[in-house]
Swiss-Prot record:
Gene Ontology CC: one annotated term: cytoplasm
Cytoplasm in keyword set: yes
Keyword terms of this UniProt record: Cytoplasm, Elongation factor, Protein biosynthesis
Similarity section: Belongs to the elongation factor P family.
GO molecular function, one term: translation elongation factor activity
GO biological process assignments: peptide biosynthetic process
Organism: Halothermothrix orenii (strain H 168 / OCM 544 / DSM 9562)
Main location per the UniProt record: cytoplasm
Claim: Cytoplasm is one of the keywords in the record: yes
Stored InterPro entries: Elong-fact-P_C, NA-bd_OB-fold, Rib_uL2_dom2, Transl_elong_fac_P/YeiP, Transl_elong_KOW-like, Transl_elong_P/YeiP_cen, Transl_elong_P/YeiP_CS, Transl_elongation_fac_P
Signal sequence bounds: none
Encoding gene per record: efp
Name of this protein: Elongation factor P
Function: Involved in peptide bond synthesis. Stimulates efficient translation and peptide-bond synthesis on native or reconstituted 70S ribosomes in vitro. Probably functions indirectly by altering the affinity of the ribosome for aminoacyl-tRNA, thus increasing their reactivity as acceptors for peptidyl transferase.
PROSITE patterns: EFP
Length: 186
């Protein structure tokens, strides 16, 4: 059992025999009433999203989730194929399950795949990834590091805001949690 005060994004819980993953949560306190936790939960069976409010401190059953080290190989249509680095077994995860995380997947990237009852439900990306800028407006003479920003399309198709001095072909470091530019690598 886990307290609703300990909720975090990615946590898997069991409610009424169905397993959900916490997508978003917010602790709230009303003026006279008690505190409560508003959540958005994703059903891992069908991908449906529900909103549920819990009383603060309420106990819910935590679903047991295994983590497997895997390597991302390629994508085929709407499916993304991963390989277990121990058994070389391959499995695919749908674009729907991965959501925005596909923007940071690079071929041959090592990561953790979360499994529930031997079925993949999600992935844990590294905190930072290095991606090449494929398309952006050219920098203009006189641009400075402390200047504005411009959109850049990365090799994975993700679009991030980058400083004006970044050019096509540059490799940049991106925070996978927020999608923000961190630094130029080369």
């Amino acid at each position: 059992m886990i307290s609703t005060n300990d909720f975090h994004n990615g946590l898997t819980i069991e409610l009424d025999g169905t397993v959900y993953q916490v997508v978003k949560f917010q602790h709230s306190k009303t003026g006279r009433g008690g505190a409560f936790v508003r959540t958005k939960l994703r059903n891992i069976e069908d991908g449906g999203i529900i909103e549920k409010t819990f009383r603060a401190g309420e106990k819910v059953k935590k679903a047991h989730v295994d983590q497997k080290n895997m390597q991302y190989l390629y994508h085929n249509g709407d499916d993304y194929v991963f390989m277990d680095t121990d058994t070389y077994e391959q499995l695919s995860i749908s674009n729907e399950q991965l959501g925005d995380k596909v923007d940071y997947l690079k071929e041959n990237m090592s990561l953790e795949v979360l499994m529930y009852e031997n079925r993949p439900i999600d992935i844990n990306l590294p905190t930072f990834v290095e991606l090449e800028v494929e398309k952006t407006q050219p920098g203009i003479r006189g641009d400075t590091v402390s200047g504005g920003s411009k959109p850049a399309t990365l090799e994975t198709g993700a679009v991030v805001q980058v400083p004006l001095f970044i050019n096509e072909g540059d490799v940049i470091k991106v925070d996978t949690r927020s999608g923000e530019y961190i630094e130029r690598v080369s």
